[in-house]
């Protein structure tokens, strides 16, 4: 089965090159524990592979024979504009990586749909010039799930798709969505992802959820990476656990791996240590 690299070098080398094509993976983390940094690194490295192969080889290296880089990278955001995201990504990765990959990532800003039913003034999130003629069009704008579905249907084939974030989508529950719609939406995306043959990464801050609701989202995904802070003495470490992932977890278990330690350097997030059953 074809693999699509996560763009995290040591992780990809551990799991036979990346995720099985057609997967939806939940990146579930505590604030600052590495989930967002994983997301940024994955987008950057997969885009850099085609945008600047020499720079990609310098920071990532060779791609395993079992893996194939996606031809396109799509970044879907509900609240942040492109310029802000680029600034945030520069806090995680070297400037030359961000500059090299920027034009190869296709950003999809769904903030007009996201904020449409909120009390946030339109001029705060929309670059469109307000006019009497445009007000009716704004009222007829698609809902957030419809807009998300349109982007995925048009662009997800064989692509890496980043969704930033499920936490934002959950916060709209009660307006355009009920809570029960969220796991169903995730299951629908997972089903479609198999047909699309790409890789979908979905960011989630699980601190905002009850264990029961978190479990529903894990169950609706093909795979879940758990990012946590681990405290020992006077130090803290970012750690990554593969909670469940069909076609990947078994490989990690065969290596007796129980947890990854992560670090953030010039090339973004990577695995710094592997803990095994002793």
Identify the role of each PLM range.
Residues 14-112:
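Walker A/P-loop NTP-binding active-site region of P-loop NTPases
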Residues 26, 160-164, 201:
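Structural motif
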Residues 109-185:
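Phosphate-binding/switch loop-helix module in NTP-utilizing enzymes
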Residues 199-267:
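Phosphate-binding/switch region of NTP-binding enzymes
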Residues 79-83, 112-115, 167-168, 206-210, ...:
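Conserved nucleotide-binding/hydrolysis micro-motifs of P-loop NTPases
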Residues 1-10:
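N-terminal pre-Walker A segment at the start of P-loop NTPase domains
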Residues 131, 135-140, 144, 154, ...:
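NTP-binding/hydrolysis catalytic cores, primarily Walker-type P-loop NTPases
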């Amino acid at each position: 089965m074809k693999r699509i690299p996560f763009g995290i070098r040591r992780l990809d080398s551990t799991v036979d090159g990346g995720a099985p094509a057609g997967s939806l993976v939940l990146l579930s983390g505590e604030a600052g524990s590495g989930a967002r940094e994983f997301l940024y690194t994955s987008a950057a490295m997969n885009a850099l592979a085609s945008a600047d192969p020499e720079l990609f080889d310098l920071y990532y290296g060779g791609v395993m024979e079992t893996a194939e880089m996606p031809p396109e990278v799509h970044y879907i955001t509900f609240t942040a504009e492109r310029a802000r995201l680029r600034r945030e990504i520069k806090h995680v990765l070297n400037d030359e990586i961000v500059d090299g990959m920027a034009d190869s990532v296709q950003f999809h800003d769904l903030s007009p749909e996201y904020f449409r039913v909120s009390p946030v003034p339109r001029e705060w999130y929309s670059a469109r010039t307000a006019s009497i003629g445009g007000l009716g069009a704004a009222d007829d704008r698609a809902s957030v799930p419809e807009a998300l579905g349109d982007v995925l249907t048009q662009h997800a084939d064989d692509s890496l798709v980043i969704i930033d974030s499920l936490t934002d989508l959950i916060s709209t529950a009660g307006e355009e969505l009920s809570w029960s719609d969220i796991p169903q939406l995730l299951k629908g995306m997972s089903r479609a992802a198999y047909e699309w043959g790409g890789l979908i990464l979905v960011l989630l801050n699980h601190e905002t959820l009850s264990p029961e609701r978190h479990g529903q989202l894990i169950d609706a995904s093909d795979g879940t990476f758990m990012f946590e802070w681990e405290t020992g003495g006077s130090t803290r470490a970012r750690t990554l656990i593969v909670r469940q992932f069909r076609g990947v977890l078994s490989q990690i278990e065969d290596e007796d791996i129980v947890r990854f330690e992560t670090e953030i350097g010039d090339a973004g997030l990577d695995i710094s240590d592997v803990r095994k059953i002793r």
